Amino acid sequence: KKICDIDLSQFNNQNNRYTTLKRTKLIEFLLKNIPSEKIVFNSDLIDIKNQNKLSLCFRDKKNEEFDYLVAADGIYSKTKQILFKGEGLPKYFNSIALRGNIQNFKDFDISLYLGPNFHFVIYPINQNKEFNFISIIRKELIQEEISNRNLFKENNFINNLLNQISSKSNLNLTEKVQKITCFPIFVSKRIQI
């Protein structure tokens, strides 16, 4: 059931403008505007030490010190594996995320839908009537399924999840959502470094 529409413009003022955008556009913007000497690609982190600052050790024997570390290297994060080695790896949260695109959705506000064991959000990403679709679905999986990264790329698996949501909402998402990606959701304990 749709629970609300959010018009972001109501939060705008002279100094702050709120918007939504496609993740790829954000990455393009960041790569264009962050000096290239500040970005290091294809580095292999092997250890993290905490003295007065965070010291990151890389496979090429290079060490760098930082005040902060943001671990944003994905679901199967090498950084998280290093950080959580004493705490155990993040655990599957019995939930799966779906992400996709919708063309020409009827409502230009952010739309939030809640249902039994799922929710989804549809929001505009540009002025060309392109929208992002994001959903979280409760789904128990056995360890073998969780470990099978190919499962989350299988069309049958993804279509079954979309059908679950579509059958409990007033939208036929299986026909509307395109370029769907699917991934398991993991949770981690909060740790102090």
Predicted regions and their residues:
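FAD-binding beta-loop-beta segment adjacent to the flavin cofactor pocket
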Residues: 182-193
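Conserved N-terminal helical subregion
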Residues: 1-84, 88-101, 142-144, 151-155
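Conserved FAD/dinucleotide-binding core of flavoprotein oxidoreductases
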Residues: 4-18, 22-28, 59, 63-64, ...
